[in-house]
Amino acid sequence: MTHTFAENYDVIVIGAGHAGVEAGLAASRMGCKTLLATINLDMVAFMPCNPSIGGSAKGIVVREIDALGGEMGRNIDKTYIQMKMLNMGKGPAVRALRAQADKAEYASEMKRTVERQENLTLRQTMIDEILVEDGKVIGVRTATNQKFSAKAVVVTTGTALRGEIIIGDLKYSSGPNNSLASITLADNLKELGLEIGRFKTGTPPRVNARTINYEDTEIQPGDEKPNHFSFLSKDEDYLLDQIPCWLTYTNATSHEIINSNLHRAPMFSGIVKGIGPRYCPSIEDKIVRFADKERHQLFLEPEGRNTDEIYVQGLSTSLPEDVQQDLIHSIKGLENAQMMRTGYAIEYDMVMPHQLRATLETKKISGLFTAGQTNGTSGYEEAAGQGIVAGINAALKVQGKPELILKRSDGYIGVMIDDLVTKGTVEPYRLLTSRAEYRLILRHDNADMRLTEIGRQVGLVDDERWQVFQIHKNQFDNEMKRLESIKLKPIKETNEKVVAMGFKPLTDALTAKEFMRRPDVTYADAVAFIGPAAEDLDAKTIELIETEVKYEGYIAKALDQVEKMKRMEEKRIPADIDWDDIDSIATEARQKFKLISPETIGQASRISGVNPADISILMVYLEGRSRSISKNKSKDSH
């Protein structure tokens, strides 16, 4: 079929949510002429659910996006109303930053960034069809029958694909927040041969801030100590004029209201068919699943500086509106609260992610990438992390350059993508620190050390960011060398100072670094003996030094494990392998290998249902196959 294209692009991104903006910005910043298409220009980087960025594991993802050259970290640093470091009483591996966002300002600031980006065109249009010829993407067709050519297309449609909002027994076609649903494109993805699933998520009601009795709630302030998501943000710009959140709880009356109305709950009446998120369940689901719990936490989160809307975190529901109102009034502090928006559930189509490569390109169609909730994840941060990887790889494909695959040891983004493409998901996927086997080396404080060089290599990290990183890295390296080179001796003068500071006296000579390994000794304590560094070190560098020194032994063990797995990852599995040709492999393993088509031995070993014996048989088979090919080549050469 011959197509007449109105405009020509290198990359087209469908959807301008959190995945879409990162994909569009990445591709355009790497030099590709890019179209970012959205159903509604007023919903660019919109937050249809919680007004926050970050949190456990997610906050580390935002740092990783920033380290690669992405925008989410910088944008939230410009638009937060509260910043808080979580899990400070725990180890460094699980600490993560969380910010309350000014929801409207976050979206408008990101839209401004997109509008000003060179090589990037932002357009309001409905994409109805992805045009494919000979198994390759060639462009898209809009609802108004305009055709645009492209060498790569990234689908980041969020919950809009055949979206349906559900409140009680009311069910209607809609994307998030009553936007248009994308129905024709959902049909098109099926026609292209992709396996489609059906998931569900939800959002809580919003209440009027002026109708809350705050005296009956617990105030939750932000941090006074400066913290940022972006490695480019400066401590002097930290906002001290923050807005608090408040904590309250459900109670026996709340639970009784829910239990007596379960027959009207879409989740239990059969109206909801999609599979919901395990780690962000609705309040009715929580009451049923955790019937022994007397109460559940609810956080009252402001949606911005210029609105009275309060997001009731923990009260996600699709119960009928009258039940939602009764439920709100049963909660301490909300007895007279006015509901401004009802909570709702939303069902949507998604692409089963086992059909993707680790680049987020579909295996079936060359040049077609998917990212975000389209791939079955939940959360803005998970979406943005996939978006930047899909955008990078779309650009690299167009440019004919080697692809980018982030390993599990590179970052939480790598963990997430590997989980999705290797194990698939049967429910909305959420990142957790427990999913990462190398979490001690995947911390929030070292994201730039892990990923900024990668971002520079692919052409996404600009000169400003690269210079900031180089200064930070050089300061860290130089100070680590200094701590290793200076020795403290157990002489009288030194030990008097050690004891005066509340530490046990030295019995042997040791380096400043070894002294810092004592649990109660800080970097500042070590500096009291050895003097300050040649250059002033910022809080980020000092935090990194303390963590690397105190956990050096554990970090070394983790890096050894990474090296062992690296050898497995380097053993490639040929794309043309015939899985039926391998004798003795278990039936379940054979079925999983056929379904997922692992690209490396490492990936094959992580597929659920595959045991070590299957991997051993596979490795023996591949070695024999390699020898056979070498012999045939040798015969042919003679």
Swiss-Prot record:
Signal peptide: none annotated. Its cofactor is FAD. It holds the Pfam family GIDA. Keywords: Cytoplasm, FAD, Flavoprotein, NAD, tRNA processing. It is found in: Cytoplasm. Its main location: cytoplasm. The keyword Membrane does not apply. NAD(+) binds at residues 276-290. GO terms for biological process: tRNA methylation; tRNA wobble uridine modification. One of its GO terms (molecular function) is flavin adenine dinucleotide binding. FAD binds at residues 15-20, 127, 182, 373. GO terms for cellular component: cytosol. NAD-binding protein involved in the addition of a carboxymethylaminomethyl (cmnm) group at the wobble position (U34) of certain tRNAs, forming tRNA-cmnm(5)s(2)U34. Belongs to the MnmG family. Homodimer. Heterotetramer of two MnmE and two MnmG subunits. This is tRNA uridine 5-carboxymethylaminomethyl modification enzyme MnmG.
